[in-house]
Amino acid sequence: MAVSESQLKKMMSKYKYRDLTVRQTVNVIAMYKDLKPVLDSYVFNDGSSRELVNLTGTIPVRYRGNIYNIPICLWLLDTYPYNPPICFVKPTSSMTIKTGKHVDANGKIYLPYLHDWKHPRSELLELIQIMIVIFGEEPPVFSRPTVSASYPPYTATGPPNTSYMPGMPSGISAYPSGYPPNPSGYPGCPYPPAGPYPATTSSQYPSQPPVTTVGPSRDGTISEDTIRASLISAVSDKLRWRMKEEMDGAQAELNALKRTEEDLKKGHQKLEEMVTRLDQEVAEVDKNIELLKKKDEELSSALEKMENQSENNDIDEVIIPTAPLYKQILNLYAEENAIEDTIFYLGEALRRGVIDLDVFLKHVRLLSRKQFQLRALMQKARKTAGLSDLY
């Protein structure tokens, strides 16, 4: 039964970056259906334990034209994705771990991708895809060979083969100090049935030429040549492994430096574009400032000129009609309004007792007669000009 996103959030309730971890986990289980999230207790080297979520199941690996289901278990720390997952190969009872530069005798997986893990560049889905590619070149497990009971047990003619676990470069830890590598008592993880795995062949291991001095002497002691050859072989293997580790680390660091260089080049280009754009904007602003100053000077000059002209100009000469008929209408209208004002002030003078009633009536009759004539003449002029009636 598929695990829903809400169930994952409940399982990862104590994770510091729960939503981000859930999102990456959902992407993984959507692509690799055999991987299932399980909440279990993880025991560290110091004996402490912690409830963590692991992805357990199989991933499809193509090896020599066939697809094999490789069982793995990925433990997600509660600080994921800022710390890498702890990865293991978990063989079934019919499988045996093949130790190498990427897998040790306990099944723990070592990859340069894990060593150089850095969020957000590194993520879980990409890690699994890298595992598939690497396991396709060097399978981490193989089928356990069956030994027929009819054959007598094989007696080695030389010293037993020494297995060397892949080590990390000195001074470098693949994981933070708060999360030490998993002890041999790592909790087991159930897996779905897996397909057949490639059986071991002599081509998987380097053949050793026969040496006449190999094996114990007749008196039961091991010869010095045998010990020396064994030590030389062990040291050579260890030196090759260390050299490979150093080369992988240097290549990873070189790739990181190249990415940093590309980012710096892109940033430099963006900064140059920003500086160019700012220079253009500054030039445009300076141009607008000069234009505004010029217009301000023109307005100030025009205003000063108009003020000087207003002091010397007659108000009657300022307004000049476009035609003689319009000038006549303007004069008639002004004169008629002047008579209207005169009659008003005569009434005020009568009210205040400044003039007598006879004087008032005499002047009002004269002004009213003239006003009537002005209005009649103005009406005629407006009609001639095609204007509407005013009264």
Swiss-Prot record:
UniProt entry keywords in alphabetical sequence: Acetylation, Cell cycle, Cell division, Coiled coil, Cytoplasm, Cytoskeleton, Endosome, Growth regulation, Host-virus interaction, Membrane, Nucleus, Phosphoprotein, Protein transport, Transport, Ubl conjugation
Localization of this protein: Cytoplasm; Early endosome membrane; Late endosome membrane; Cytoplasm, Cytoskeleton, Microtubule organizing center, Centrosome
Modified residues (Phosphothreonine): T221
Tissues of expression: Ubiquitous. Higher expression in brain and mammary gland. Lower expression in liver and tumoral tissues.
Coiled coil: 237-317
UniProt domain UEV: residue ranges: 2-145
Bias type Polar residues, positions: 200-215
Gene3D superfamilies per record: 6.10.140.820, 6.10.250.370, Ubiquitin Conjugating Enzyme (3.10.110.10)
GO biological process assignments: cell differentiation; cell division; exosomal secretion; extracellular transport; keratinocyte differentiation; negative regulation of cell population proliferation; negative regulation of epidermal growth factor receptor signaling pathway; negative regulation of transcription by RNA polymerase II
PTM comment, free text: Monoubiquitinated at multiple sites by LRSAM1 and by MGRN1. Ubiquitination inactivates it, possibly by regulating its shuttling between an active membrane-bound protein and an inactive soluble form. Ubiquitination by MGRN1 requires the presence of UBE2D1.
Residue ranges, annotated region (Interaction with CEP55): 159-163
SMART domains reported for this sequence: UBCc
Function: Component of the ESCRT-I complex, a regulator of vesicular trafficking process. Binds to ubiquitinated cargo proteins and is required for the sorting of endocytic ubiquitinated cargos into multivesicular bodies (MVBs). Mediates the association between the ESCRT-0 and ESCRT-I complex. Required for completion of cytokinesis; the function requires CEP55. May be involved in cell growth and differentiation. Acts as a negative growth regulator. Required for the exosomal release of SDCBP, CD63 and syndecan.
This protein's domain notes: The UEV domain is required for the interaction of the complex with ubiquitin. The coiled coil domain may interact with stathmin.
Name assigned to this protein: Tumor susceptibility gene 101 protein
Taxonomy of the source species: Eukaryota, Metazoa, Chordata, Craniata, Vertebrata
Gene: Tsg101
